[in-house]
């Protein structure tokens, strides 16, 4: 009976908490243009799924699956925020050092708050897992009710700090754009007089020095043409010399080839003259040997063992 009253009390408390603190359904009000915003939206979607506390969520909460996923999403978000902040720092350009330091501190503080919120959320989920494990099969409705309330509060705080970080980064980006525009203006102011002087000098050259430049260019062109003709003649002469040399080399090679062929034929004839008598003599000796063997066999027949036994 006491257990039944405890369940009813927990149900009433859960209903009161739900009525006193409605479900957060607000969305982050910006377009996910930057990589850090896209990473934060992935974290936000996963948190929304965890907040449902469905059977699958509760099952994964009892293991380390949820905290591992949240840790990975947190690290991705913080990494993208740092990368975007570094990119904006490189674009600040000639902004005053005081302004740079102030903007950097504001962004860093907002970034730290968001990171602390994420860390607090992960720790709270780990605490829930430990509490569930210590219940040893008892009812966990009260623990889930407290977790649901805490998740709603954490989601509000995360939204507030995320929007604050987005605003700080927007101010930082505006400062970077302003610094870049100032840098371009300063460069334009410095280069403006130089460009004007160059334009005037070009106009003066066009008005008073055009003819000397044309004469000089004509003379230079004549020298170039003469030099090219000279180089062409030298190249033709050199090519003719190379062709004659190659023809001479070819003739010598043909002559040497003919001599080698004749020497080979002479050597072949000598070898033939050396070995033919020897081969003929060996043939004669072999024929004589065979005749002697045949004659010996004919005069002395071989007596087989069978014949001896018959005798």
UniProtKB/Swiss-Prot annotation:
Modified residues (Phosphoserine): 139
PTM entry text: APOE exists as multiple glycosylated and sialylated glycoforms within cells and in plasma. The extent of glycosylation and sialylation are tissue and context specific.
Region LDL and other lipoprotein receptors binding: start-end pairs: 150-160
Gene3D superfamilies reported for this sequence: Apolipoprotein
Keywords, comma-separated and alphabetical: Chylomicron, Endosome, Extracellular matrix, Glycoprotein, HDL, Heparin-binding, Lipid transport, Lipid-binding, Oxidation, Phosphoprotein, Repeat, Secreted, Signal, Transport, VLDL
Residues reported to bind heparin: 154-157, 221-228
The Sequence repeat ranges on this chain: 72-93, 94-115, 116-137, 138-159, 160-181, 182-203, 204-225, 226-247
Any one GO molecular-function label of the UniProt entry: metal chelating activity
Localization: Secreted; Secreted, Extracellular space; Secreted, Extracellular space, Extracellular matrix; Extracellular vesicle
Reported consequences of knocking out the gene: APOE knockout mice display severe hypercholesterolemia associated with impaired clearance of dietary fats. Excess cholesterol is more particularly associated with the atherogenic very low and intermediate density lipoproteins in the plasma. These mice are therefore prone to atherosclerosis. Mice lacking both Cx3cr1 and Apoe show decreased atherogenesis.
One Gene Ontology term, aspect cellular component: high-density lipoprotein particle
Annotated InterPro entries: ApoA_E (IPR000074), Apolipoprotein_A1/A4/E (IPR050163)
Positions where Methionine sulfoxide occurs in the chain: 135
Described purpose of this protein according to its UniProt entry: APOE is an apolipoprotein, a protein associating with lipid particles, that mainly functions in lipoprotein-mediated lipid transport between organs via the plasma and interstitial fluids. APOE is a core component of plasma lipoproteins and is involved in their production, conversion and clearance. Apolipoproteins are amphipathic molecules that interact both with lipids of the lipoprotein particle core and the aqueous environment of the plasma.
Family statement: Belongs to the apolipoprotein A1/A4/E family.
Quaternary assembly: Homotetramer. May interact with ABCA1; functionally associated with ABCA1 in the biogenesis of HDLs. May interact with APP/A4 amyloid-beta peptide; the interaction is extremely stable in vitro but its physiological significance is unclear. May interact with MAPT. May interact with MAP2. In the cerebrospinal fluid, interacts with secreted SORL1. Interacts with PMEL; this allows the loading of PMEL luminal fragment on ILVs to induce fibril nucleation.
Protein's UniProt name: Apolipoprotein E
Organism: Mus musculus
Gene name of the encoded protein: Apoe
């Amino acid at each position: 009976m006491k257990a039944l009253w405890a369940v009813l009390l927990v149900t009433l408390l859960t209903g009161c908490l739900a009525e006193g603190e409605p479900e957060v359904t607000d969305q982050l009000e910006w377009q996910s243009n930057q990589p850090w915003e896209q990473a934060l939206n992935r974290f936000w979607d996963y948190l929304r799924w965890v907040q449902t506390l469905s059977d699958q969520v509760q099952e994964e909460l009892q293991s380390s699956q949820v905290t591992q996923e949240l840790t990975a999403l947190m690290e991705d978000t913080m990494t993208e925020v740092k990368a975007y902040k570094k990119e904006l720092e490189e674009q600040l350009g000639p902004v005053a050092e005081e302004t740079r330091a102030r903007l950097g501190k504001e962004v860093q503080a907002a970034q730290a708050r968001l990171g602390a919120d994420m860390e607090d959320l992960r720790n709270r989920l780990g605490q829930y897992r430990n509490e569930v494990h210590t219940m040893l099969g008892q009812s966990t409705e009260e623990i889930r009710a407290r977790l649901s309330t805490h998740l709603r509060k954490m989601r509000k705080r995360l939204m507030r700090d995320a929007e604050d970080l987005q605003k700080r980064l927007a101010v930082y980006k505006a400062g970077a754009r302003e610094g870049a525009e100032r840098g371009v203006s300063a460069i334009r102011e410095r280069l403006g007089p130089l460009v004007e002087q160059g334009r005037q000098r070009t106009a003066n050259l066009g008005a008073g020095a055009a003819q000397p430049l044309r004469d000089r260019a004509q003379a230079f062109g004549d020298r170039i043409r003469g030099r090219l003709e000279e180089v062409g003649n030298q190249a033709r002469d050199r090519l003719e010399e190379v062709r004659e040399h190659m023809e001479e080399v070819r003739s010598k090679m043909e002559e040497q080839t003919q001599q080698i062929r004749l020497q080979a034929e002479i050597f072949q004839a000598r070898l033939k003259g050396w070995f033919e008598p020897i081969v003929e003599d060996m043939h004669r000796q072999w024929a004589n040997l065979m005749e002697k063997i045949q004659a010996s066999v004919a005069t002395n027949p071989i007596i087989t063992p069978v014949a001896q036994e018959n005798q």
